[in-house]
Amino acid sequence: MASSMLTKQFLGAPFSSFGSGQQPSKLCSSNLRFPTHRSQPKRLEIQAAGNTFGNYFRVTTFGESHGGGVGCIIDGCPPRLPLSESDMQVELDRRRPGQSRITTPRKETDTCKISSGTADGLTTGSPIKVEVPNTDQRGNDYSEMSLAYRPSHADATYDFKYGVRSVQGGGRSSARETIGRVAAGAVAKKILKLYSGTEILAYVSQVHNVVLPEDLVDNQIVTLEQIESNIVRCPNPEYAEKMIGAIDYVRVRGDSVGGVVTCIVRNVPRGLGTPVFDKLEAELAKACMSLPATKGFEFGSGFAGTFMTGSEHNDEFFMDEHDQIRTKTNRSGGIQGGISNGEIINMRVAFKPTSTIARKQHTVSRDKHETELIARGRHDPCVVPRAVPMVEAMVALVLVDQLMTQYAQCMLFPVNLTLQEPLQPSTTKSA
């Protein structure tokens, strides 16, 4: 066996050379070079800038508050979807500033333009670029903030991370970044409506200490018209007036308040979401918590469920008149085991008070001196009313991505019709 090994070649030199008594320096061929020092490790490339969301339906937002404009690029949109600027403009108008006395007085038309990804009113399957110009910037309003950090704002942490920041309007930390999300969310909402008849609605359920009782809203029948009937976007007129009063009270005093947005999703296909790390409620929580000013997220019964026993909290099953498995209650919020069960998805997102306020606050300057700051600029006394379409958009982006995931993994082969719900286009027409 040893003699047979001597005939094999090793690194370009005869293996038999090792037994010839030659010096190590003469064992190698003239063409072979061994390194005399440790090689440098490869440079680690990290692609984690945090500006892209989604796996199959991918959205990248761009732009800053006081730059030339903002927008998004949508990659992975199915071809042949009827799409125009008007589909997005409806949602952008709901998000737009300057709508009422309880929002920022900044005047922007937020008119969007699709510059790629469509032809003859249909998507082509290639990336869709949507742009919205900024037209009402006032950079001088931020002169003091270039020197001193706004308490509870991203000013300081952006400096801590990058060592530089865009002062005017807060740059990427501004809520104007969400224009791209809302535009992309409009596309996602249209896909969901056309494909499965899925309807996403959000509304304001709390402003400061004004809390809308849950039993005053029937999530089965509440409509967009009811939500949009007042400037605070609360479907109950009585509580809407109370919420508007709470915002007006702090607005005239240069202060701000927070609140809660409730979001429901009707006609959700069963089977969306995957176990363990990519559970549907986990994806929804991440999406909603990525919005500016968010500080809390509840799903289904949420924290109130901790006061209940298992027998009180469990959603018991029954067979409905269409021979479908349903639940008598919906404390699970439409998701069990990280997977949608076909019931109404129900979640709540908490938003903190706007951090930029016209009241004197103690802070620290960039050169590390304690000082005081009274912030100028045009800011929402309460972000919650304008956050409603933002929450809807992020929920839509999650659900359309999960719809594509479900189709890719579980619908390639014939489904088990006794247990699974086949995914197929809905007969529902979009508005």
Swiss-Prot record:
Family: Belongs to the chorismate synthase family.
Keywords: Amino-acid biosynthesis, Aromatic amino acid biosynthesis, Chloroplast, Lyase, Plastid, Transit peptide
Cell compartment(s), UniProt: Plastid, Chloroplast
InterPro entries assigned to the protein according to its UniProt record, in alphabetical order: Chorismate_synth (IPR000453), Chorismate_synth_AroC_sf (IPR035904), Chorismate_synthase_CS (IPR020541)
Membrane-spanning parts: none
GO CC annotation: chloroplast; cytosol
Keyword Lyase set for record: yes
Species whose genome carries this gene: Solanum lycopersicum
UniProt name for this protein: Chorismate synthase 2, chloroplastic
Expression tissues: Predominantly expressed in flowers and roots and, to a lesser extent, in stems, leaves, and cotyledons.
Biased amino acid composition, Polar residues: 112-126
Cofactor(s), by name: FMNH2
Stretches the record annotates as Disordered: 93-141
Xref: PANTHER family: CHORISMATE SYNTHASE
SUPFAM superfamilies, A to Z: Chorismate synthase, AroC
Catalytic activities: 5-O-(1-carboxyvinyl)-3-phosphoshikimate = chorismate + phosphate
Pathway(s) the chain acts in: Metabolic intermediate biosynthesis; chorismate biosynthesis; chorismate from D-erythrose 4-phosphate and phosphoenolpyruvate: step 7/7
Gene Ontology molecular functions: chorismate synthase activity; FMN binding
Enzyme Commission identifier(s): 4.2.3.5
Domain of life: Eukaryota
